[in-house]
Amino acid sequence: MLVLDSSVILAWVLDDEQPLGPELLRRLSTTEVAAVPVHWILEVTNGLRMAVRRRRLAPGDPRRILDRISNQPIQVDTETVVRAWRETPILADDHGLTTYDAAYLELAIRLDAPLATLDQDLASAARKAGVTLFG
C-alpha cells in the first residue's frame, strides 16, 4: 500500500515530466494499492478542470481521464474525515501544511505507508515525520 497525493496523478495524466510515473504505474498495475484521503477525487477533478481552462486539456478529456483513473487500484480512506477533527489540523500546524496536504501525511503515518507526492513542502514534512517517500 502507498498513499497517493493528487499532484502525482495529475502530473501522470497531464503528461508532465515526473520521475514517479513509470514505477508508480508498474506497481499499481501489479499488486500495489493506493490509499487516498476522501478529498483526493475533488483535488483531482479540480486539477483537470483547471487544465481545461488553461487549454492543457480539451473539454472532453477529463471524463476519459477519470475513467482511466477509476480503473486503478485506489482505495478511498473514509477515516480521514474522523481524523480531520484532531490529528490532521495538528499535523498541519506542526509542519506548516494546508489541512489538505496534512491529510495525506496523516494517512501515510496511520497506515505506515510510503507517500507518493511531487509537493516539496509535503515531502519535507513527510521526511521530518519519518514517512518514507515513494520513488
Locations of the language-model features?
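Acidic, PIN/NYN-like endoribonuclease modules and their adjacent C-terminal/linker elements
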Residues: 1, 105-135
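Short, well-structured N-terminal submotif of metal-dependent ribonuclease cores
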Residues: 1-39, 51-63, 128-129
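Short glycine/serine- and small hydrophobic-enriched flexible loop segments
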Residues: 46-53, 109
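Alpha-helix capping/helix-boundary segments
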Residues: 8-9, 40, 83, 104, ...
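Acidic catalytic patch
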Residues: 38-41, 61-94
